[in-house]
């Protein structure tokens, strides 16, 4: 008999949805939204629904695999674990533990996925990656400005007179905030969307501003310039609660409004209009992630933060520079899981440059890579170098559910469970502040095992099994210790499924910032002044490159896949689609459906052309995440350069050319 059970979405996404999952005869039948969830209210996206397909897919990896003479052969778990443990011990004895690289990302938001750190710390410490492909530049930027990256509670947008959605297509990536926008608009709020692409969110806006890709920070400086010229700044907030304002005044005086308009390709009239909008408090700003995926990405977020501060929209209802909400994740005792004090050795590679660093590593060289919660061959920039690096080492171990592009390179593949086959807690530090409970609903197929089981077995073989003697419930209780006095326990979560975390709904309302000065820092204490930086690949920084490669390439999040996780589950094999601005199609006499080649000095891809109405001139988009085996990863075109603050990617800082294939 079928049962409908509550669960939660594990995907690394803004919304962290509640689920109703239909289970019959130990099989997932259907995934739908939980109407009782306080934020997601029964609505989920196609990516969440496809978790049923993912769980039941006949392509699931069911047994440990070892590559022998270029072909994968099934082996027992004992053989796989014994051989991997032997290699780990030998590598540590001969070269040191940092000859092992742990390459990982956030394919699953389960809180117990952090136990991988406990294993590697117990092993002695390995080469870890730092930074983020996704949002690292912006997180670091807000730490310089505010001391941390905190966002307003979802309902607070309903207090906004004006709402500026800057580079964030919430209709695609944050659907429950999209619902809030519709409600706010019905209540009379004025919605402005700033984006190079005229997307589904722009369609509900009162005003759409098309901006040159990578020039959002310059636009923010221009708006600030007009706010100051018109005398609309919040002088009291600036005087009492900020540091370095005179540096901002000098900065915006260094460019004329005409030059700013030329660089951003936004009219002076629209810049002046935006200045009045920001000064018409309360105005909330909701930033996306794409606008900081440039060399100047951290500075871009800092300039937008500065604009929000100058206009007096910090710490007030209906305001905020909303980028992330790290106070959600900070509510948990993750340190209880990781045992960071156990490691005796340590080395770090940048997540963006990990391929180059693998190839260049000495003292010690990288001898083994273990990949968890990621598909680096598809998702890392400059994928040809990634393939070379991951093919160059002695042993590659991949923990996954499917034969991804990365798994195909592996020496060992360890089949792991889906979220419905293990118990965990789920949250997102991107939007709302609720934690969801996800019970184990069905048994794992074949011999698939949880990540936790794998780490436990390896730890036992390597002599630190005592660090993994706890039950799954005990692990979860460890993470909730800091919340027990607030009534948030594992028992209450199991009973109620979703609980609100005790975070500040209006961050910085007390104007007590976490910076060294205790103030909002226009000029960061340790990192210095704001600058009017531009992307590395632009006509302003590299005119010769821009002449050969005149088009800005964006690689936005796909509608139907969470990065690379869903493409292989489509009923029809996915095909690479090249979306272009109308002027490109007109200049090159192209039409929908034409086969085109997109290239630069790093690589090329081929796909079917689609014309994007109202997209910013000279802009191309190719959704990220498509696998090499389905036609080529767009990351063969992107650069591994780091952002200005060293913690973000430059995936959108990419010039290309395009031609029709005849």
Where on the chain are the PLM-derived regions?
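Flexible glycine/proline-enriched surface loops and loop-helix/loop-strand junctions
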Residues: 163, 204-205, 255-258, 286-291, ...
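N-terminal export/assembly segments and adjacent metallocofactor-ligating motifs
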Residues: 1-230, 254, 259, 267-268, ...
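Long, contiguous, secondary-structure-rich segments that constitute the structural scaffold
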Residues: 445, 451-496, 569-578, 584-662
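Glycine/threonine-rich phosphate-binding loop and adjacent beta-strand/alpha-helix elements that clamp
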Residues: 154, 420-444, 454-455, 459, ...
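Acidic/polar loop patches that form or flank catalytic/metal-binding clefts of enzymes
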Residues: 29, 128, 234-235, 271, ...
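Extended redox/cofactor-interaction regions of prokaryotic respiratory oxidoreductases
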Residues: 114-182, 187-194, 201-203, 217-221, ...
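Hydrophobic alpha-helical scaffolding
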Residues: 7, 51, 70-74, 105-109, ...
């Amino acid at each position: 008999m079928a049962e409908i059970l509550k669960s939660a979405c594990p995907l690394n996404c803004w919304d962290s949805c509640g689920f109703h999952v239909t289970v019959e005869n130990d099989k997932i039948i259907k995934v739908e939204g939980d109407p009782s969830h306080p934020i997601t209210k029964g609505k989920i996206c196609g990516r969440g629904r496809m978790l049923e397909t993912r769980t039941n897919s006949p392509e699931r990896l069911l047994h440990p695999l070892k590559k022998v003479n270029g072909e994968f052969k099934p082996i027992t778990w004992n053989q796989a674990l014994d051989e991997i443990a032997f290699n780990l011990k030998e590598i540590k004895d001969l070269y040191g533990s940092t000859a092992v690289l742990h390459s990982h990302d956030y394919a699953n938001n389960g809180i117990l996925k952090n136990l991988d750190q406990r294993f590697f710390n117990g092993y002695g410490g390995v080469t870890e990656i730092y930074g983020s492909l996704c949002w690292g530049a912006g997180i670091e930027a807000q730490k310089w400005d505010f001391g941390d990256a905190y966002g307003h509670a979802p309902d607070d947008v309903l207090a906004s007179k004006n709402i500026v959605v800057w580079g964030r297509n919430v209709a695609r990536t944050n659907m429950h905030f999209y619902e809030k926008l519709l409600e706010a608009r019905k209540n009379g709020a004025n919605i402005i969307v700033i984006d190079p692409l005229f997307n589904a969110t722009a369609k509900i806006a009162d005003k759409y501003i098309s901006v040159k890709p990578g020039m959002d920070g310059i636009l923010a400086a221009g708006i600030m310039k007009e706010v100051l010229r018109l005398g609309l700044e919040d002088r009291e907030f600036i005087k009492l609660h900020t540091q370095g304002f005179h540096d901002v005044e000098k900065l915006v005086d260094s460019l004329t409004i005409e030059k700013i308009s030329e660089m951003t390709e936004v009219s002076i009239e629209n810049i002046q209009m935006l200045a009045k909008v920001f000064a018409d408090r309360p105005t909330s700003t909701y930033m996306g992630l794409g606008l900081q995926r440039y060399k100047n990405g951290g500075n871009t977020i800092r300039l937008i933060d500065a604009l929000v501060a100058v206009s007096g929209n910090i710490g007030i209802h209906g305001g905020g520079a909303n980028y992330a909400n790290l106070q959600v994740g900070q509510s948990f005792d993750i340190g209880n899981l990781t045992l960071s004090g156990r490691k005796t050795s340590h080395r770090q590679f940048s997540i963006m440059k990990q391929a180059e660093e693998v190839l260049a590593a000495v003292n010690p060289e990288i001898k083994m890579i273990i990949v968890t919660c990621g598909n680096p061959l598809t998702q890392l920039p400059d994928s040809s170098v990634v393939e070379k690096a991951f093919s160059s080492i002695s042993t590659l171990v991949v923990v996954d559910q499917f034969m991804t592009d990365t798994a195909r390179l592996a020496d060992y593949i360890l089949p792991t469970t889906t979220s419905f086959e293990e118990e965990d807690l789920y949250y997102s530090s991107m939007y709302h502040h609720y934690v969801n409970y996800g019970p184990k609903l069905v048994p794992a197929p074949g011999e698939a095992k949880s990540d936790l089981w794998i780490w436990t077995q390896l730890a036992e073989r390597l002599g630190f099994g005592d660090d993994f003697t706890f039950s799954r419930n005990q692990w979860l209780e460890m993470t909730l210790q800091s919340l027990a006095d607030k009534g948030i326990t594992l028992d209450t979560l199991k009973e109620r499924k979703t609980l609100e975390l005790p975070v500040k709904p209006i961050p910085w309302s007390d104007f007590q910032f976490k910076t060294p000065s205790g103030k909002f820092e226009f000029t960061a204490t340790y990192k210095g002044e704001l600058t009017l930086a531009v992307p590395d690949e632009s006509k302003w920084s590299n005119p010769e490159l821009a002449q050969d490669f005149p088009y800005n390439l964006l690689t936005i999040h796909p509608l139907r896949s969470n990065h690379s996780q869903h493409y292989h589950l489509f009923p029809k094999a996915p095909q690479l689609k090249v979306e272009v601005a109308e002027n490109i199609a007109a200049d090159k006499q192209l039409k929908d459906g034409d086969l085109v080649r997109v290239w630069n000095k790093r690589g090329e891809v081929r796909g079917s052309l689609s014309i994007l109405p109202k997209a910013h001139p000279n802009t191309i988009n190719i959704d990220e995440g498509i696998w090499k085996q389905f036609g080529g990863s767009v990351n063969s075109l992107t650069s591994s350069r780091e952002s200005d603050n060293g913690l973000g990617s430059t995936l959108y800082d990419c010039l290309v050319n395009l031609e029709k294939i005849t």
